[in-house]
Amino acid sequence: MTPPRLFWVWLLVAGTQGVNDGDMRLADGGATNQGRVEIFYRGQWGTVCDNLWDLTDASVVCRALGFENATQALGRAAFGQGSGPIMLDEVQCTGTEASLADCKSLGWLKSNCRHERDAGVVCTNETRSTHTLDLSRELSEALGQIFDSQRGCDLSISVNVQGEDALGFCGHTVILTANLEAQALWKEPGSNVTMSVDAECVPMVRDLLRYFYSRRIDITLSSVKCFHKLASAYGARQLQGYCASLFAILLPQDPSFQMPLDLYAYAVATGDALLEKLCLQFLAWNFEALTQAEAWPSVPTDLLQLLLPRSDLAVPSELALLKAVDTWSWGERASHEEVEGLVEKIRFPMMLPEELFELQFNLSLYWSHEALFQKKTLQALEFHTVPFQLLARYKGLNLTEDTYKPRIYTSPTWSAFVTDSSWSARKSQLVYQSRRGPLVKYSSDYFQAPSDYRYYPYQSFQTPQHPSFLFQDKRVSWSLVYLPTIQSCWNYGFSCSSDELPVLGLTKSGGSDRTIAYENKALMLCEGLFVADVTDFEGWKAAIPSALDTNSSKSTSSFPCPAGHFNGFRTVIRPFYLTNSSGVD
C-alpha cells in the first residue's frame, strides 16, 4: 500500500510546484485561447463565479496568459463545470491588473455560487509579440549608491540644529530635479542648501536624502514621527502621506505607550487634527492597558481632560477608572484644581452604593477633595435609590447626560468573551441545540449543533438589567455567538448576507422593561495585546471588520491586526434609561 500512496502524493506536489497564488489557467476549452477560468490559491485550483463577469475581467485573464485581449466573457459554465472550490465571486477589474486576485471581489473563498455559474473566456488567437528586458529594479539602488558615494556633486547641503551645523552632505541637482519630492532642495537658488532640523531627527536626514535619490525608504515605529515631520517641512507629499497611513499600524506596536503619547504630543504641537483624533481613539479603546503601563504617571493632564469625558473609554469599571486617576495623582503633576476637574468627569452613578461607601477608606484623593466626593456620592445614591421618573420630576435631572450612562465596561459583570474558532479550538464547555428542541445548557464556550453542523464559539451570560441598584436583583440573560457562515446564521435564527460575514450575534431573554434601552458594543481583540476596533450591535448583530486591508467589500479595522485575524471578541452590555418611556429595548 505504501508505494501507491507515495506516488499519488508525489503527483499532487509535482502538479503545484512553481505555481503561485493568483496564477490562472484555461481548462476544457478545446484550444489554448479559450476555456473555463481557473485560479490558484493555497495549494489548489478553483473556479470563478460569473456574477458581474464582463469583458474587462476576461481581458485581465487573457493578457496574463500572453494573449492580446479577450473577445468574449462567458458564464453559465460554458466550458463545463469545474471542480474544487469557487475561489472568487463578484470580480470587478479595471483592466490594468496582473491577475484577478488584484481585482475587487468578495475575497478569497467567499461565494454562494455553484459550479453551473463558472466563468469562461475566449481570447484573441494572437499572442503578444513584444519581449521586454526590464532592469528598472536596479535603478533605485544604483541612484542610492550615487548618493552614498558623495562624489561628483554640484550641491552642498548643510543640516542645521538650533543655529549650528550638525551634518553636511553633497547632492546632484540633475537627479534631485527629476523628483518632485525633493523640490524644496533644488528650488533653492545657488549651490548651497540649509536644512533646519530638530536634534531628535538628525539621524534620519541621511535616509531622507537617499530616499530623494532611490525613492525607497524603510520606516519603523521609532522613525515614523521624524520622517513625517521632515516630509511635512520639505514638501515630500508622498512620503508625508505614507507616514500618515502608517500611524494606525504602528501605534499599537508599543506596549509601553510611550510612542502613542509622543505621537499625540506631536499631533497637538503641529496641529495635525487627524493624527490627534487617531491617538485619542487608540488610547480610549486601550485605556485599561494604558493605566497599567509604566507611562501612566506621565500622561499629561490635558490629555486626561480629553479622555475622561468619553463614553468609548474601555475600562473594567468606573471604580477601576477612579482608582487609576487616584494612582496618577500621586505623581503631583497636576494642581488641586486640575485634579478636581478630572474627578468631576468620573461617572459616580455607575458605581454601586457599597463601592461609593468604601471610597473614603481606600482612595487617597477622597480627603483632599472631600466636599466634591460627598456631593458626587449623594448624586449617585439618588440615582441608585429613586425611580428615574421622580428624579426627573422633582430634581430636574437630565438622565440622558453621559454621567448617567455606562462607558465600555469590560468586567464580567457587563461583558462576555468568545474566540474565533479558526484561531482557537478550546472547547471547555458544550451547549447543544436540536433542530426542534430548546437550547439546553451544560456549560460552555462552544455550541455543538447536530452532526451535520459545525462548532461555533458561543457564550451565555447574565447581567443586571440596569446599573441602578434598583435593578440589581433583576437579571437579563444573553447569548453571544460567532457567526462565520450563512448556515450558522440560520442555525441561530439570524438573517445574514454573504458580504457581512463573519458577524457576532447577540440574543436577549428576560428583563423586559420599556424604560430601558441598550447600546451594546463589540470589541475586536488582536493577539490579546490591544483593542483594534469597536463596533455597534445593530439589530442584534455586530459587524466584524477585516483585520487587515484587503480587496474585500468589508471595512478595515481602525487599527490593523498584523496576525490577519482577531483572536477574540468581547461584547459589552450598555443599558440606559429611555426618559420618555416610549422606547423598547
Swiss-Prot record:
Ubiquitous. Detected in body fluids such as semen, milk, serum, tears, saliva and urine. Expressed by keratinocytes and fibroblasts. SUPFAM superfamilies: SRCR-like. Residues 260-360 form the BACK domain. Residues 153-221 form the BTB domain. The keyword Amino-acid biosynthesis does not apply. Keywords: Cell adhesion, Disulfide bond, Extracellular matrix, Glycoprotein, Secreted, Signal. GO terms for biological process: cell adhesion; cellular defense response; signal transduction. Disulfide bonds join C49-C113, C62-C123, C93-C103. GO terms for cellular component: blood microparticle; collagen-containing extracellular matrix; extracellular exosome; extracellular region; extracellular space; membrane; platelet dense granule lumen. Residues 24-124 form the SRCR domain. Glycans are attached at N69, N125, N192, N362, N398, N551, N580. Pfam families: BACK, SRCR. It is found in: Secreted; Secreted, Extracellular space, Extracellular matrix. Residues 1-18 form the signal peptide. GO terms for molecular function: scavenger receptor activity. Homodimers and homomultimers. The multimers form ring-like structures with a diameter of 30-40 nm. Binds LGALS1 and LGALS3. Binds ITGB1, COL4A1, COL5A1, COL6A1, FN1 and NID. Interacts with the gamma-tubulin ring complex (gamma-TuRC), composed of gamma-tubulin, TUBGCP2, TUBGCP3, TUBGCP4, TUBGCP5 and TUBGCP6. The unglycosylated form interacts with PDE4DIP isoform 13/MMG8/SMYLE; this interaction may connect a pericentrosomal complex, made of AKAP9, CDK5RAP2, EB1/MAPRE1 and PDE4DIP, to the gamma-tubulin ring complex (gamma-TuRC) to promote microtubule assembly and acetylation. Promotes integrin-mediated cell adhesion. May stimulate host defense against viruses and tumor cells. This is Galectin-3-binding protein. It comes from Homo sapiens (Human).
